[in-house]
From Swiss-Prot:
EC numbers: 3.5.1.15
Record protein name field: Aspartoacylase
Family: Belongs to the AspA/AstE family. Aspartoacylase subfamily.
Taxonomic path: Eukaryota, Metazoa, Chordata, Craniata, Vertebrata
Cofactor(s) essential for the protein: Zn(2+)
Keyword flag Hydrolase: yes
Gene it is expressed from: ASPA
Known partners and oligomeric status: Homodimer.
Gene3D superfamilies the record matches: 2.20.25.160, Zn peptidases (3.40.630.10)
Organism of provenance: Pongo abelii
Amino acid sequence: MTSCHIAEEPIQKVAIFGGTHGNELTGVFLVKHWLENGAEIQRTGLEVKPFITNPRAVKKCTRYIDCDLNRIFDLENLGKKMSEDLPYEVRRAQEINHLFGPKDSEDSYDIIFDLHNTTSNMGCTLILEDSRNNFLIQMFHYIKTSLAPLPCYVYLIEHPSLKYATTRSIAKYPVGIEVGPQPQGVLRADILDQMRKMIKHALDFIHHFNEGKEFPPCAIEVYKIIEKVDYPRDENGEIAAVIHPNLQDQDWKPLHPGDPMFLTLDGKTIPLGGDCTVYPVFVNEAAYYEKKEAFAKTTKLTLNAKSIRCSLH
């Protein structure tokens, strides 16, 4: 009996990035550990390379030195002539692209897992860049099922103007892993354990796939970005209101028109306008104050994946 499935090439090269942001310590801590003792991330027939992406920022325990490394992996920055005048992160991006890419080439790594923390109450989050990627939808379904009953959310950043050029985007299959809440420059054991399990399940999925296991059609719930929301500001551009207590820590929960969104110092509530229910994420994220983002609005939808199987079997 034959089944109708998509034959995918086997996965051979995997990288795990930590320290893309130097003050998000779970990935830094895990990658440093795996560089010393990588037994738990090794799988038969698979090359798995742990890697510290922004060592200078890690050393200073800061998000970045000159600019955000996780926003500059576009072909323009990757193609700039190397010189000492370039921002440190642009030079580093070119080095990373040389080691793990080149981006959009046959030689690039198959999968890059990029490990991040958020100060927002987002729990375990997988970040997806392409809603039509059967392989990653299948992987995310496997991770979500394996983590249950612990919730694991999928954040889809596929958007013509809001998608950004991530560090992991040089891989054929880019995977963002975001776990919180955790303050910048801090390690929490519970967050560490959750991220470690996410990587374990992801590598197990790849191993099963390479061994010839067929994954039947599946569906996952995802939250797709639709808009970034700035804080209310005064005429000088200063923040004029804070996240309302009713919204604080309510990532992934429905926010209805009329629900409190911001609170001013004189006690005035600013509600959500419009006529659509949204699902906020990255609520009050510390790193996004400089980006003028109080939270991101998402809409909830379902993605379907076809059956997949490794082409070697």
